[in-house]
From Swiss-Prot, chains A, B:
Enzyme superclass (EC): transferase
Pfam families: Kinase-PPPase
Protein name as annotated: Putative phosphoenolpyruvate synthase regulatory protein
Keywords: Kinase, Nucleotide-binding, Serine/threonine-protein kinase, Transferase
Regions that span the bilayer: none
Superkingdom: Bacteria
EC number: 2.7.11.33, 2.7.4.28
NCBIfam families linked to this entry: PRK05339.1 (NF003742)
Presence of keyword Lyase: no
Family the entry assigns: Belongs to the pyruvate, phosphate/water dikinase regulatory protein family. PSRP subfamily.
A GO MF label: phosphotransferase activity, phosphate group as acceptor
PANTHER family given in the database record: PYRUVATE, PHOSPHATE DIKINASE REGULATORY PROTEIN 1, CHLOROPLASTIC
Length: 277, 277
């Protein structure tokens, strides 16, 4: 039983990239926070031979006393059948739900590799890549003229989270997000920064705890005025006042991930009818 | 039965962002390609009251003859219980597998909202944000000195897919990816471009069908020499020859998504032992 105490092996087996399988596995395993785990990813396991290679790995680990887990999103009968012979608990993540859907739709699922292809819906894929080009071109206010083409304009002080959020919105959701970095000039004005005036309905404010901002900026430019706690407090206070005056929707990014900030932006776009669903 | 013929409503209900729930739903529904669907996302449904609001929506749609589906990753008993009262097939995506895991680990899962928090593992999150800064700083070869700090260096002609791939690797996987854009000078040399010489083991080549490259570049600079089919054919041919001469791992991006290209890079990093799992 040499395996006791070792992080338990978690195999992620997919006939494609394995991103979905790993997401589900992590969503499940996060509910057992005390368990030490190690992930072993086996993407593109798309035939019985590849599955058998995984089974052999699992057997070797089991023989040395480890207790592997297998999570798979494959829908190929021969791959599933092979995996079921491994000395491990197999989490077949799709099959049971496919059976339920077969009943709902009164038609059999189309099984086999390649069914879930990221580029299958290639119009959606192209719009993601276009949105990414867009976000890169307009990053940090260098593309004022493109505000008119934006789905959303993220407004906030430097390093409040605008760039990661806009890239994430583009890559994951095909949303065209621009940034407007608030700076000294903007705080001396009462109303909106001039380039934003006609796009008020697209604005989304990002705020952040000044101490967190201070830490982030210090990593970038240690000892600078830009990174000082006084400057950070001043900028965040003025930005918050501006957001309040304009009645902008605001998200605090201090302890939010890009996924969470993006979810807030998407919810806003949906509420205002600019995005379906 | 006014609902017949309408795209069928697919509710995505999560106590968090809903990304995992939507990924699973899409992985399942892609096996029924002929079914018209519309997605209705209800993230942050984290208590019985919020769940009841979703149930009311479902009831209204069902009353007008539609047949909604509900996909949920919630693990909160009160939310699940409420959803089960809706006139819709509910796909409870985690519960059954949590029960299996409870048996495997011989301990009960920690249920409730916030269990699956993107920033819970904040070291991993910070490394993703750092990798993103890194990718942005080194995009398109402007950061030669940072090649030493890179996990991988993507090499290819302009618009072969380097930038989206490096951003995706950073945002999703915390991988530090740099780019090296191959240009005229590089093709006149026999060996590696000078800045890359000492980092050969980190190189990953991206190639693309010249006609596809021509189409992409034409969108960007119509009628230019840069976009001409002759120039595209020349560059791709010379790049491929260079990759072959150096024995680099190469991925054809012509009909691959960033997810797929990234999976190829990750597989390489794992094979060479530079990345666990």
């Amino acid at each position: 039983m040499s395996g006791w105490g070792m992080p338990r092996p978690v195999f992620i087996v997919s006939d494609h990239t394995g991103l979905t399988a790993e997401n589900i596995a992590r969503a499940l395993l996060t509910h057992f926070p005390g368990q030490p785990l190690r992930y072993l990813r086996r993407p593109f396991t798309s035939d019985a031979q590849a599955a058998q290679a995984v089974v052999s790995e699992v057997e070797a680990l089991a023989a040395s006393g480890e207790r592997p887990l297998i999570f798979t999103t494959t829908t190929q009968p021969d791959v599933l059948e092979a995996l079921q012979t491994a000395p491990a608990q197999v989490f077949d993540l799709l099959t049971e739900n496919l059976r339920l859907l077969e009943g709902e739709f009164a038609e059999p699922p189309q099984l086999g590799a390649g069914g879930h292809h990221d580029m299958q819906d290639s119009e959606a894929y192209l719009s993601r890549m276009e949105a990414l080009d867009f976000a890169l071109a307009t990053d940090d206010g260098i593309g004022d003229k493109q505000y008119g083409l934006s789905d959303v304009i993220l407004v906030g002080v430097s390093r409040a989270g605008k760039t990661p959020t806009s890239l994430f919105l583009a890559l994951q959701h095909g949303i065209r997000a621009s940034n407007y970095p608030l700076a000294e000039d903007d705080f001396e004005r009462e109303g909106l920064p001039a380039p934003l005036e006609q796009y008020r309905s697209k604005l989304f404010g990002l705020t952040i705890d000044p101490r967190r901002l201070h830490a982030i900026r210090t990593q970038r430019k240690p000892g600078s005025k830009y990174a000082s706690i006084e400057q950070c407090e001043y900028e965040v206070r003025r930005a918050s006042a501006l957001f309040a005056r304009l009645g902008l929707p605001v998200k605090d990014t201090t302890s939010a991930s890009v996924e969470e900030i993006a979810a807030g932006v998407l919810a806003l776009l949906r509420q205002s009818g600019r995005l379906e669903g």
